[in-house]
Amino acid sequence: MYKKIPTYKKGEWSYTEFETQEEFARYLTTLFKEPGQYGFDEVALLFNEEANRFNKNGFYCDKPFRSKDYIKYWNDQKEKCREGVIYYGEKNTWYITRDYYMWLNFLPIFDKEEKKYGFAKVRDAQYHMALYEALAEIHHKHAAILKKRQIASSYFHM
């Protein structure tokens, strides 16, 4: 098996398996659209659920340190940061790449709009950029990006 990706569908977690790199590349290609056409819905609120939990509580996991539940939580998060996550909505499906998931949930950045440190917001342009780079990587290509200023891409490409 080439990849096993955590998958969220209708409130349940499971896995989507890809037998080959080519199968995964074909799957990513089906998800790739023009910016503005990704159709984020309420499921997109889950993309940065861990960052929102941290903002609300001041910590990520409320389980006792080194307990089985604590270790399971962090193992699940490490897996999502290594493999990415697939989310199914009512009409659309999204693959959050491993680096985009980590960036949204675990890398506070300076928000120039709010003038304070916080987590990145889910933005169509950054999702598109992450998917574009994943497609380039899987096809062993380089990626050139023409983008507007002030969308935190310097943080994303560290």
Q: How would you name each of these model-derived features?
A:
Residues 1-158:
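Phosphate/NTP-binding elements of NTP-utilizing enzymes
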